[in-house]
Amino acid sequence: MTAILERRESESLWGRFCNWITSTENRLYIGWFGVLMIPTLLTATSVFIIAFIAAPPVDIDGIREPVSGSLLYGNNIISGAIIPTSAAIGLHFYPIWEAASVDEWLYNGGPYELIVLHFLLGVACYMGREWELSFRLGMRPWIAVAYSAPVAAATAVFLIYPIGQGSFSDGMPLGISGTFNFMIVFQAEHNILMHPFHMLGVAGVFGGSLFSAMHGSLVTSSLIRETTENESANEGYRFGQEEETYNIVAAHGYFGRLIFQYAGFNNSRSLHFFLAAWPVVGIWFTALGISTMAFNLNGFNFNQSVVDSQGRVINTWADIINRANLGMEVMHERNAHNFPLDLAAVEAPSING
């Protein structure tokens, strides 16, 4: 008997690296998008933690009045934030080597731009990695499509809005109270509450929460009992089992009698598509709204739109919102200008008619 042995050529280092990167057998899938995602997210996270703890005050408005954002400079978890890059920098690319010194870079808010740009690259690569893993496992690509909604929202507030307004100083601060400040100022300057795309986003988020709670409670209430009364119903499920774990007919019948016959889904696949699509489409619209308001295509203005036969203004809730907007605009960046643009007009807007 003759044995013929074929000597396999040793695989190159690059080939082994490619196989390891794209292997679905790894505990955590890396993928080609992961090659870029890992360093960018690690950089953004590391700089965020360091800056949140120890960054010196930043001259956000470019008027030599620094604003403190870090814990070591008097803030707590609620009030602390990464202060946006100075208005003196505008939209310029501002890496460390563009500043005369690290102190100057910190004073002008360089960490904000570094964190935001690395973060946006990282989350975009995370979305690509979701698609890549789905592709390699033979799955459909809708996980990455759903994740595109928060990616679009983050891109809108951290990149598109600063581009439209002309400065990274108008981007959303990276902190709790900074986020609230951004929301208040955005309302004052763009009347976002009266923008239909924001309304669709609210419907998407609250509606998605409602539908998720309804679906979860219906499924939990119609589980097929596999255990005794003394055991948890959850013990009756085995991972990977072929049998249905709940009675969709019972859930559909309950919901149809609670509201009306055709209110519930009788197809589990279309139901779950709806649960995914509703909030995703809503957040897409919100991101689109932020991106249009970035270029000052603002919410509806119904100020003083109702008058009586004598021409006297009858105030509506739109006028109440307008008054609140003026108050918020007066208070923000109070040292950067003498008057907000709305109040510095030749003819002051009438409030009481």
UniProtKB/Swiss-Prot annotation:
Positions bound to chlorophyll a ChlzD1: H118
UniProt-annotated site: Cleavage, residues: A344, A345
Enzyme class: oxidoreductase
PROSITE patterns for the chain: REACTION_CENTER (PS00244)
Subcellular location: Plastid, Chloroplast thylakoid membrane
Membrane topology of the entry: Multi-pass membrane protein
Stored Gene3D superfamilies: Photosystem II protein D1-like
Binding-site residues for pheophytin a, renumbered to this chain: Y126
Positions annotated to bind a quinone: H215
EC number: 1.10.3.9
GO MF term (any one): oxygen evolving activity
Residues recorded with modification Phosphothreonine: T2
Residues found modified as N-acetylthreonine: T2
Residue intervals passing through the bilayer: 29-46, 118-133, 142-156, 197-218, 274-288
Site entry: Stabilizes free radical intermediate: H190
BP GO annotations: photosynthetic electron transport in photosystem II; response to herbicide
The record's account of how the chain is modified after translation: Tyr-161 forms a radical intermediate that is referred to as redox-active TyrZ, YZ or Y-Z.
Presence of the UniProt keyword Iron-sulfur in the record: no
Residues annotated to bind Fe cation: H215, H272
Pfam families in alphabetical order: Photo_RC
Manner of cofactor binding, per the entry note: The D1/D2 heterodimer binds P680, chlorophylls that are the primary electron donor of PSII, and subsequent electron acceptors. It shares a non-heme iron and each subunit binds pheophytin, quinone, additional chlorophylls, carotenoids and lipids. D1 provides most of the ligands for the Mn4-Ca-O5 cluster of the oxygen-evolving complex (OEC). There is also a Cl(-1) ion associated with D1 and D2, which is required for oxygen evolution. The PSII complex binds additional chlorophylls, carotenoids and specific lipids.
Record propeptide residues: 345-353
PANTHER family, A to Z: PHOTOSYSTEM II D2 PROTEIN, PHOTOSYSTEM II PROTEIN D1
Function: Photosystem II (PSII) is a light-driven water:plastoquinone oxidoreductase that uses light energy to abstract electrons from H(2)O, generating O(2) and a proton gradient subsequently used for ATP formation. It consists of a core antenna complex that captures photons, and an electron transfer chain that converts photonic excitation into a charge separation. The D1/D2 (PsbA/PsbD) reaction center heterodimer binds P680, the primary electron donor of PSII as well as several subsequent electron acceptors.
Subunit structure: PSII is composed of 1 copy each of membrane proteins PsbA, PsbB, PsbC, PsbD, PsbE, PsbF, PsbH, PsbI, PsbJ, PsbK, PsbL, PsbM, PsbT, PsbX, PsbY, PsbZ, Psb30/Ycf12, at least 3 peripheral proteins of the oxygen-evolving complex and a large number of cofactors. It forms dimeric complexes.
UniProt-recorded name of the protein: Photosystem II protein D1
Name of the gene encoding the protein in the UniProt record: psbA
